Amino acid sequence: MSLKAFSWILLSAIAIGFILLFNYWASYQLLSTLAYAGIAAALGGLANAVIPFRFLGIRRRIVGVVILAGGVVLMVAALIWPAPMFRVGHPQTYLDDAMPEYQFWEKHSVRIHARPEQVMQAVRQSTFGDMKSLSMLLKIRSAGLRTPSQSTGALAADRRILDAFSASGYVSGGGEHEIVTCGGANVPARRPLKPRSLEECASYREPGAIKVAFNFTAGDAGQGWSVVSTETRVLATDDVTSRGMGRYWRLIVPGSGLLRRQWLAGIKRRAESEP
């Protein structure tokens, strides 16, 4: 096998592995995947425009320039693509009632060897310490946005996550096997929404707002097992805000998905440690 063929096979395997890992975190968000694929292609093209990768059969810098341009076009197209509106036809959960319309979403689940009641208790007790990558991702976000990092006290490792959301103006509700939290912010006014109930959060339509709702549900899977799922939904209440949120969401959703995976892992450890 030639070096060129081996290099392309290795590069393809790495790309496939990256895409699978990326989508494991990001719940198969196509536009986010395409945006990051465009970024990777642009960086690869830039490198080839400087020094062509001859081991891949690329011998001219112009090829790198073409790859760079194609990557930029793909990235921009994925980031500015209009977000579709999803509507719940027949509400089945408290989350459906709190957020029946949304443009952005992610969902994750895990099996836990514990009863649903133990799982929901573990959800309530989960802390920021469960999110191992939170500090690193916040530093990256702050550097990218050129804003101060979140105060360490607000995100202390032993602080309960749901308590922090409540302190930020989010409202919670639900039932025995479902917890729903809803809130958000008015972007132009730079203030939190602070709804007084899930119903008020659902009906809020003031322009410039971004509403966020997420839930945890636990279902009996038999033989002492449960399936816990968490879904996040986001609604921007006008077109301008939706376009901005679309760009932001497609860039941050891999990190968001990673944190939710870690959150679920912490819930699993806590629930399975109960007698």
Describe the role of every protein-language-model region:
Residues V65-L79:
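Hydrophobic membrane-insertion alpha-helices, especially the h-region
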Residues S126, G184-N186, G208, M245, ...:
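Glycine-rich, low-complexity intrinsically disordered segments
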Residues L34, G44, G244-P275:
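A conserved amphipathic terminal alpha-helix motif
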Residues S12-P52:
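Membrane-embedded alpha-helical segments of integral membrane proteins
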Residues W25, L30-A37, G57-V63, L79-W81, ...:
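Hydrophobic-ligand binding "helix-grip"
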Residues M1-S12:
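N-terminal membrane topogenic signal
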Residues F55, A77-V171:
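Hydrophobic ligand-binding cavity/cleft-lining segments
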Residues I62, E199-G255, I267:
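Beta-strand/loop substructures that line and gate deep hydrophobic ligand-binding cavities in soluble
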